[in-house]
């Protein structure tokens, strides 16, 4: 038998089968840097319609984790998909650079500011440290293949940005949304500073649970509130608390106006007593206190008890009964001990009754010297002493432990307290900010849609935002206030601008260096500088003003999109919304997209302590960034995002399918010159015309999916196209034609033209997701092209089939269904040992008239569609159990038999004319025509 390999057009390409991504990707990054690709993209798309995704700044501290990677990859997929869709989509990454975690790090290195080191030097070290962290994180983000202006990012520590943050504060102040108040705020005793709601996270904490009695100050007066009071023994009201440390600050008890209270006779240690408790809570209170025998000896409502007084359990302090809407019957006694220093509701109800705070704690959570019994003790450690004192005074009725959800600092992970201090607030209601924000929320597109309900609920319940911090490393609240009244200077707008100009030159140190006399003149003796700094959520929250509107390449408000993790409804989305509405009266974003957290296969949050964490660096070093990017695209980001080693392996398999399909296409067009070999669309063979139409249709679907941020659909459709329509059908069918026909024949060039169109489109479809691989593929596609795929838009060489085409979409859909049924029958026959490969067989198709029409339309080329050596069509009435088997396709039976003919040594088909030609005894007539003659002709497949 002769070797005919040299007569075949076999696929050939230098495009590697193995991705070898961990080695190739860094080389690609270097090339992108060398050619200044990001800058070239900006130049190429200059003047087109803009799409602005505004980057929520990660905190400049520590290595990036998987959550960071997910966030940046999602942003990059969107920015690149908008670019390929023809938008000018610049991406300016940012970093949040002020605040407590950086202060803590620097404190461990050089000591506390004002103690071991001067404030200016401390701020210099903080700046230095933050910039080091930015450099580290930037390297990892770039390694992910994320495009952006990485070496001109926005940093909240940039002098210009710091100045613009101060300007934004000035605008909010002059628009009347700012107020100074003495209110309880979340306070970190570890950090010695106030915290905003967004900096609070809730974790389980085990606390002391105690019931305490407050004796009546005037029993006779108190009992007059009960119309039918009887019984004997001392009268007291019972409170329940899980924060014994707040009792030194207890100034009142609160009751519900409409709640029914019971005067209850009981006996404790043989002594008769009468307790006042909400009647509905009586059973649970008595059970907690170990009292079995009791009876109600009087009833009244909370309203009846208003103004009655009790005595503090261990101080000589009169405790009035107040009415408060916050009192519920969910737990406790229906009576709430009220400490205005340590709770918003407590503060509000005391404020209504004219009861002032007493400020018993210092910044570090230590009781001041004037606090009787507990001076010098720390809130974290004082509970046992408080309980001991209550026991000694006979006021402790029960003591247990309770595990409950408790506020913790999201940075230091330590429990928070409420502490009343003078602070600066953005008022939610003074100028109607809450209502305006709620109205703006409705105009924004929220992805997923439940995000709208979530942020609406948060804004509805949001307290005034405490924006002041008692820290060293932060943007100053650059105001002058009157020494006596604490009112803002009447010329605040001008003064803020003067300060901002100085900060623009030398940074936030300018505020501390400014001489008040230089700005205020004679007024300086009556005014003082505010020494507080801004909440870091204010820094990032005003980047719509300090960055979006300031950067020339962005230059628009609102942004098209904000994209962050789902925790940012209470964080950056909310702080940005409040400040934008306060300054501009508008939301800072048109769309908001949120993604879920990363979890392991069991749904557990990833953490080092659990040992289930997967670091992005580990994935990139082992599998490559493109595998991580593909996992992000293939995962539903609207819920928790599950990742494990098994999932990564499956993702790598999917990647190989896309890569191998691309490689096969490249191998098939290796000698193709699109300038001279391209076949006109109308001249393509029917099957080739169909695959181009299918690619056109898919491209339209992918454009829509990208536009809707439905990357799972993009992944599924592309993967399905590669594995089913290309891999299992089209590329399988055309092998014979492409390999065996004359290279310059219409049949061969038509197949190459179609594949050229497909790879040109496919490479663009995957570029936003598989960025490294797409760029690699791009460099192997024949023909002149731009130096990067990322300078291109969606491929315009695809065309849909004309409506009503004889062999249109419906025709090929019907044929594919028949082919699937034939393949199944062939597989069953092969498994049963009746036949070998499909080319050793001939098939008989017994079909309905309509189906016969479809099948006969392909004439002699029908066998190529089934990859069999013969295919005959008969009426379904000619079928029998002996000559065919039923199929899933209604009206179709298939007969399969081994061919009796010899095998062609070149095309491997079994044909009756093999050996009929003397010059080539082992070839079929078709192959001889393709070698020695003018070549076979095909019309369809």
Swiss-Prot record:
GO molecular function term, any single one: isoleucine-tRNA ligase activity
InterPro entries, sorted: aa-tRNA-synth_I_CS, aa-tRNA-synth_Ia, Anticodon_Ile_BEm, Ile-tRNA-ligase, Ile-tRNA-ligase_type1, Ile-tRNA_ligase, M/V/L/I-tRNA-synth_anticd-bd, Rossmann-like_a/b/a_fold
Assigned GO CC terms: cytosol
Top-level class of the enzyme under EC nomenclature: ligase
Biological processes, Gene Ontology terms: isoleucyl-tRNA aminoacylation
Substrates-to-products reaction catalysed: tRNA(Ile) + L-isoleucine + ATP = L-isoleucyl-tRNA(Ile) + AMP + diphosphate
Signal peptide range: none
Keywords, comma-separated and alphabetical: Aminoacyl-tRNA synthetase, ATP-binding, Cytoplasm, Ligase, Metal-binding, Nucleotide-binding, Protein biosynthesis, Zinc
Note on how the cofactor is bound: Binds 1 zinc ion per subunit.
Residues the entry annotates as binding L-isoleucyl-5'-AMP: 564
Enzyme Commission number(s): 6.1.1.5
Cofactors demanded by this protein: Zn(2+)
Similarity annotation: Belongs to the class-I aminoacyl-tRNA synthetase family. IleS type 1 subfamily.
Domain remarks: IleRS has two distinct active sites: one for aminoacylation and one for editing. The misactivated valine is translocated from the active site to the editing site, which sterically excludes the correctly activated isoleucine. The single editing site contains two valyl binding pockets, one specific for each substrate (Val-AMP or Val-tRNA(Ile)).
Protein task: Catalyzes the attachment of isoleucine to tRNA(Ile). As IleRS can inadvertently accommodate and process structurally similar amino acids such as valine, to avoid such errors it has two additional distinct tRNA(Ile)-dependent editing activities. One activity is designated as 'pretransfer' editing and involves the hydrolysis of activated Val-AMP. The other activity is designated 'posttransfer' editing and involves deacylation of mischarged Val-tRNA(Ile).
Known partners and oligomeric status: Monomer.
Name of the protein: Isoleucine--tRNA ligase
